[in-house]
Amino acid sequence: MRLTPLPAFDNNYIWTLIAPDGRAIIVDPGQALPILEAHSKGLIPTAILLTHHHADHIGGVPELLERWPTLPIYAPHDTRIALNYHRIGEGDSLNILGLRFQVIHTPGHTHSHLTFIGNDLLFCGDTLFSLGCGQIFEGTPTQMLASLQRLAALPIQTRVCCGHEYTLSNAAFALHVDPTNTALQKRRQQANAMRLANLPTLPISLESELNTNPFLRTAAPTIHAATATHLQRTPIDEVEVFATLRHWKNNFPIKNIP
């Protein structure tokens, strides 16, 4: 199977897993056009997986259904997803094109957000980003941290497939928080070179994220110290460290911060 991220909008990725015969699993098609263009080159949509209800992740589905009306769709229980689809949730598993994916509930960004795990791949939508995490629109910091900790416990060789290309803007904030992290410094240099070459910085290994993403390192002394300095007091617990990081980033002066 070939894993390919298809760019959409300004910074979204539509993830595709393509079999040798062209049949493909599609994750979060916010736009139809990238899929239609890939179809002209041999891609055959076989199933759609949706992580959450936001338009930039599901907006292309109606047009794709016009072309492939029997295409199966798997998505969370959420009345805001106005489609005919298979409702799935925590503990479910999917077997598509010979691949098995576990479904886990990862609330925080939205109440019903799902993540798909299998075959050393992690399709995490807007929960975990390269060097960052999603904004907390509907959940709580406690929920979001718990979701991230579940993902952090996966095998380190897992490849993280996020919904957006945010690595460079996330790196700026991460380095502001953790400036002496040499692995993080190296990642920013690598990501900058990749983006200059118009290459995606994803997927990225979970091992790399564990070493460089401040939102996965809330127990690390350097991250704890940085949030204490920002708060001008000692954080109460790890949840407050995380909540402080998220609020801090929300107000960090860089364009296109997620």
From Swiss-Prot:
Zn(2+) 1 binds at residues 52, 54, 109, 126. Disulfide bonds: none annotated. This is Hydroxyacylglutathione hydrolase. NCBIfam families: GSH_gloB. Binds 2 Zn(2+) ions per subunit. Its cofactor is Zn(2+). It catalyses: an S-(2-hydroxyacyl)glutathione + H2O = a 2-hydroxy carboxylate + glutathione + H(+).
